[in-house]
Amino acid sequence: VLPFRGRTLDCAGVGFSVGLMFGNGGEGDRYVGGSGFDWAGFRDDPFGVNVDFRLRAFDETPVAPSDVSALARFEFMEGLSGSQHADILNGDDRDATAIALSGAYGSVLSDDYMDMVDGLRAFINELADPLTSLGEVTSFGAGNIILGGNGSDLIAGNGGDDLIDGDMWLNVRISVRENNDGTGAEIASFNSMVPMIPLMLNGTYN
């Protein structure tokens, strides 16, 4: 996963799944999700980020040039994970009805994809089960999931029934497997695409 600045990262065309996008909160960045429960993560930001999911990537009303208009913008993003520094993290105002209609097929985190992130199912059950009293939770789409990471963060869920933890954070590693279809033993693991690029160019990994 490459950090990006001033670009659009788009998961809208990858189907109904879970999109994991990592950036640095740079000016002009656009995080565009789609169907499925999509995450914006900022684990590598060196200073701390100011993120507001209410700043839409496709806002019909243009914002006049200002500090606000330079911030990263988001569309159909449900999960947010901060950096190891002091962050300001704001969720959006969507509720269960809006999230179910986000993207072509809705953006509810379904049972099939809950285990794509280790520990996510346990976290959701720990926070959501006391609210629902329905036993194990097999889906979540009532609001955002916001994880602060290290640092003294300011977190606001805003609309919806959000799940918030100030210490947890989302991490992603790229696993290189024995077979081209992703099966088999793990050969190597990388924290980002950057160290993989020369190994792919020289044919070490295809």
Describe the function of each predicted region:
Residues 1-206:
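Acidic, glycine-rich low-complexity segments
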